[in-house]
Amino acid sequence: MGKEKSVRIGRQALLLAMLDEGEEGAILDELRASNWRYCQGRVGAMEPQKIVAAIETAAKRHEVVDGSLYRDMHALYHAILEAVHGVTRGQVELGDLLRTAGLRFAVVRGTPYEQPKEGEWIAVALYGTIGAPVRGLEHEAVGLGINHI
């Protein structure tokens, strides 16, 4: 593999998901300077299909992915599922356990390697709180998925 650029796609996605509104200015400037595409959003459900739908809708709406291209959608789905596994500690069906969740997400698409032949990559980051169905007793959780396009 080629030498990495100074901008790391997973780190950028994690920071974008974790920083509060108004704090992400420097990250957004870096993404724009690199001609990388991105989107952010929130999801309050733990059902995997709702998480996937929220992220997929945002990524299409902000033109991070082209919904008509299989390779774009395939890469996005794999990155989402990997991020969900991180947040849920591998137990994807948490919606059935009546867990509470408040997650922010970020999707970043770009070319993190100097070698152009390495192509584009996509990163999905999830950050927020998850816990038992007792408001106020949630804990933080984070997940990251990265896939080539």
Curated annotation (Swiss-Prot):
Q: Does the keyword Nuclease apply?
A: no
Matches recorded under InterPro entries:
Regulatory_HutP, Regulatory_HutP_bacillales, Regulatory_HutP_sf
Q: Which domain of life is it from?
A: Bacteria
Protein's GO biological process: L-histidine metabolic process; positive regulation of gene expression
The name this protein goes by in its record:
Hut operon positive regulatory protein
Task: Report the sequence similarity comment from the record.
Answer: Belongs to the HutP family.
Which of UniProt's keywords are assigned here?
Activator, Histidine metabolism, RNA-binding, Transcription, Transcription regulation
Q: Gene name? A: hutP
Function of the protein? Antiterminator that binds to cis-acting regulatory sequences on the mRNA in the presence of histidine, thereby suppressing transcription termination and activating the hut operon for histidine utilization.
Do you know which HAMAP family this protein is assigned to?
A: HutP
Which NCBIfam families does the entry link to? Answer: PRK03065.1 (NF002838)
